[in-house]
Amino acid sequence: MPLASSASCRSRVMNLHVIRLATIVAAFGVIVACGTSQTSETNDAPREPAGFDRQVMRVSTVDSAGGIESIDRCVWVADTSDERRRGLMGVTTLGAADGMLFVQEQPTSGAFWMKDTLIDLSIAFFNQDGEFLDAMNMSPCLATNGNDCPRYQTPSSYVFALEVAQGDLAELGIHSTSIISLVDQTCSSSTARE
C-alpha cells in the first residue's frame, strides 16, 4: 500500500479541522439563537402593575332623589413620586384592579403622557375633595423621544387622577357628579375585578 504524501495528509487534516470548526460554529449559532429567542407565550404574557399597593376607592354619586349612592372599586395606588413616574408604563393588563389612582401630595396642574404605555386609557381628574373635574381618552406613545409624546392636562388643579382602560369610566360609575375617596382597606373579592 503506497504511503500518502505529507501534503495530502496535511490537506486531509486541514479539511477535518475546517469541518470541525464549521460544525462548532453552526452548533454555537443554534445555541445562541435558541437561548435568546423568546416564545410568543413569554412575549404575550400579560403584564400587570408591579410594586403598587391595591386599595379600595369609593365612588359616590348623588342620585336624582338627592340621595348618595356609593360603590367600592379596587385600584392600584401610585402615591410616591417614583410610582407616579412609572404609572402604567409597560403594562398590558390592569389585572385584579379597575384602574390606577395617582395621588398627589398637594394640588397640581402637571400633565400626563403615555410614553411606553401599551394600552389605551381614559383618565379622570378630581380635586382635593375628590370631586370630578375633567376626563379624556389617551393613546399609547411608543416614540423613542418622550418630547414627541402628547401631554394630557386638565385646565384645573387636581389631587387625584384615575387611569382606567379606555371607555371604562362610565362602567365604574365615574361621571360629572362623582366624588371619589380612598378607603383605608385593601381590596377584597367583592371589590377586585375577576
Where are the regions a protein language model picked out?
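Residue-level signal for mature regions of secreted extracellular proteins and peptides
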Residues: P2, A27-F28
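Short secondary-structure transition/capping segments
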Residues: P2, N15, R151-Q153
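Compact, glycine-rich, soluble single-domain proteins
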Residues: G35-E194
